[in-house]
Curated annotation (Swiss-Prot):
InterPro entries: Ald_DH/histidinol_DH, Ald_DH_C, Ald_DH_N, Aldehyde_DH_dom, G-glutamylP_reductase_CS, Glu-5-SA_DH, GPR_dom. Its main location: cytoplasm. Keywords: Amino-acid biosynthesis, Cytoplasm, NADP, Oxidoreductase, Proline biosynthesis. Pathway: Amino-acid biosynthesis; L-proline biosynthesis; L-glutamate 5-semialdehyde from L-glutamate: step 2/2. It comes from Corynebacterium diphtheriae (strain ATCC 700971 / NCTC 13129 / Biotype gravis). Pfam families: Aldedh (PF00171). Gene3D superfamilies: Aldehyde Dehydrogenase, Chain A, domain 1, Aldehyde Dehydrogenase, Chain A, domain 2. Its EC number is 1.2.1.41. Belongs to the gamma-glutamyl phosphate reductase family. This is Gamma-glutamyl phosphate reductase. The gene is proA. GO terms for biological process: L-proline biosynthetic process.
Amino acid sequence: MLMNNADVRSQERKQVMVCARAAHRVAPIVAQLTSADKNAVLLDAAAALEAAGAEIIAANQRDIDQGRARGLSEALIDRLSLDSARIAGIAGGLRQVAALSDPVGEVVGGSVMPNGMQMRKVRVPLGVMGMVYEARPNVTIDAFGLALKSGNVALLRGSKSAQHSNAALVAVVHRVLESHGLPHEVVQLLPCETHESVQDLITARGLVDVVIPRGGAGLIEAVVTNATVPTIETGTGNCHFYIDRDVSDLDQAIAMLLNGKTRRCSVCNATETVLIDSALDSAYQLAIITALQEAGVTVHGDVAQLEAVGASGIVPADEHDWAEEYLSLDIACALVDGVDAAMEHIRTYSTKHTEAIATGNIVTAQRFADRVDAAAVMINASTAFTDGEQFGMGAEIGISTQKLHARGPMALPELTTTKWIVQGTGQTRP
């Protein structure tokens, strides 16, 4: 007998709550694992994923076939796709996490009080970590690896478009957990038949300690707006690159701009808007625009303004363009009257991810760094560097654009919290 929508919804909600309660139950077990225990699981999981490549690719092909039948774009199909090389990359990511320092138990502060009490502030796991993400199966294993190494349990709510791939990946991990005598509830894949299952996860207060959304602006906004569980907002990236009148090397500035825009245009640290100082020679302004177009980038802007410096082929921009995270070979371009105007434009449209300046003026650079509100500010560097590995932090779960609990690349330490341990010798408070 076929279930109606109400039956599906009821069953799905029950499944989410069963998973959340199970995760809450096993969280203390994971929190007490030694670094050696966690590393052994991660390394065995890496090997098991590579060994199960054919199984994973077959499941992934089902998702690809269904995605094409539903009319998914080839760009989305590419994000969804897994092959031997990508599986090797995912396995390599687990090995990298195993090699990272374990943050759990790290003493990050403390002192001896005048009464002799010893105070220690130590890192401890967050607990049950929920992940809501879109059609990138690699996130399934990234989240598992980072959660485990930081002593957390993972509840994963992936996209329906990747459900077979995600299920195959988690099945491999479950076999490894079982071989180490650990419960499979260390990582669980939540049902994804309806969008409401996200709501079930993000309102499971008391069972889930934090939810991290990773995906497009709509997904992130929906989670942050509706959650009662604490959330960490991983950013949409409307990243700006400002080229100042005192730029010391225009060719270098153009190279940084092109790197930020074209290296990987579909990631959150890609440059989406270029702001050019109107005091720059018009030939330099034109050179910047031309370089973008020659690299295959479509330039959106004020047509009259940009044609006045000799540019052609400009797509008219409206208010939407200045706020747009294109995630494609498109860029918004505007001429601005100096660094203050650039900072005002950024303040108006920024998602507070990464903002960059190209200048040879130390005072201007410092002014920009001090006044721009963003998780990362680049001075004479590409926006593409906002990345946990590039920052020397190792693997990351995402880039946080909020100010609490973490900001910027979220690596292992950012997936912990702290507690105070106070060692006394019988002291009582007067």
